[in-house]
Amino acid sequence: MVVSLKGRDLLCLQDYTPEEIWTILETAKMFKIWQKIGKPHRLLEGKTLAMIFQKPSTRTRVSFEVAMAHLGGHALYLNAQDLQLRRGETIADTARVLSRYVDAIMARVYAHKDVEDLAKYASVPVINGLSDFSHPCQALADYMTIWEKKGTIKGVKVVYVGDGNNVCHSLMIAGTKLGADVVVATPEGYEPDKKVIKWAEQNAAESGGSFELLHDPVKAVKDADVIYTDVWASMGQEAEAEERRKIFRPFQVNKDLVKHAKSDYMFMHCLPAHRGEEVTDDVIDSPNSVVWDEAENRLHAQKAVLALLLGGVKTGF
């Protein structure tokens, strides 16, 4: 089946069908092979991506800039000081103006509504580079990595341990759409958004996967194929950091926890990691850790997103 994503926004993976997500993953795999063998793939010659950063990021900025360079295009970095938003210009007007100059907009924002408003008023594709609700580009890289390492996604037990945050949301959504058995373990009061839980349950019913929410990390990771965690306090939650350290301490991914998983389990983390908090050195630096492959796959997954949304590749190859 030929799937066209040209002109689409990528705000949340719940907006995408399993077939569309697989199209992105297959395209990402193709680009990764092409890069490895030195095959040029300058499919976006003359195209420009505007990158709006309300929140700084190493991986997001570098991977999107390199992705556009490999595809023959150009990435333009815009932080809060570069935009007129702080002086009163609305997001709607910013979106309208940027649409006259560039071919796509990637935004890394605090509030999800900001990226939704950009998409509402922009006439070019808008990509969510991270919001407080979702992180779709990270989840695409995550499931690309699982597919590479496990040979499949369907039936793989993916366990997320920690805060029910934006990364958790996207991991839940994509995994249940692709038939994984997704388990989330959080402290009480730190569960994922109820709307996302409902989506995950609906997705799993349609895909043949499953979803389970627990508050016991040991029970959650039993026979896990993948153990995933993230920081306990996200950017903007610094005031809560000390309290969160106490609450999340029993949810640390360490050698005592991972011994309950399968012996060939994979450890994953979106990075940056706070070593000694959500994960210990002996786990993140172990042979079971795939965090560096996972980080690399951000590049390939985002190349696929850019090429597909900007019409640089035809699917069905």
UniProtKB/Swiss-Prot annotation:
Disulfide bonds: none annotated. Its EC number is 2.1.3.3. Pathway: Amino-acid biosynthesis; L-arginine biosynthesis; L-arginine from L-ornithine and carbamoyl phosphate: step 1/3. Keywords: Amino-acid biosynthesis, Arginine biosynthesis, Cytoplasm, Transferase. Carbamoyl phosphate binds at residues 57-60, 84, 108, 135-138, 270-271, 298. One of its GO terms (cellular component) is cytoplasm. SUPFAM superfamilies: Aspartate/ornithine carbamoyltransferase. It holds the Pfam family OTCace. Its main location: cytoplasm. It catalyses: carbamoyl phosphate + L-ornithine = L-citrulline + phosphate + H(+). It is found in: Cytoplasm. L-ornithine binds at residues 166, 230, 234-235. It comes from the Archaea. GO terms for biological process: arginine biosynthetic process via ornithine; citrulline biosynthetic process; L-arginine biosynthetic process. The keyword Amino-acid biosynthesis applies. GO terms for molecular function: amino acid binding; ornithine carbamoyltransferase activity. InterPro entries: Asp/Orn_carbamoyltranf_P-bd, Asp/Orn_carbamoylTrfase, Asp/Orn_carbamoylTrfase_sf, Asp_carbamoyltransf_Asp/Orn-bd, Orn/put_carbamltrans, OTCase_ArgI. Reversibly catalyzes the transfer of the carbamoyl group from carbamoyl phosphate (CP) to the N(epsilon) atom of ornithine (ORN) to produce L-citrulline. Belongs to the aspartate/ornithine carbamoyltransferase superfamily. OTCase family. Homododecamer. This is Ornithine carbamoyltransferase. It comes from Pyrococcus horikoshii (strain ATCC 700860 / DSM 12428 / JCM 9974 / NBRC 100139 / OT-3).
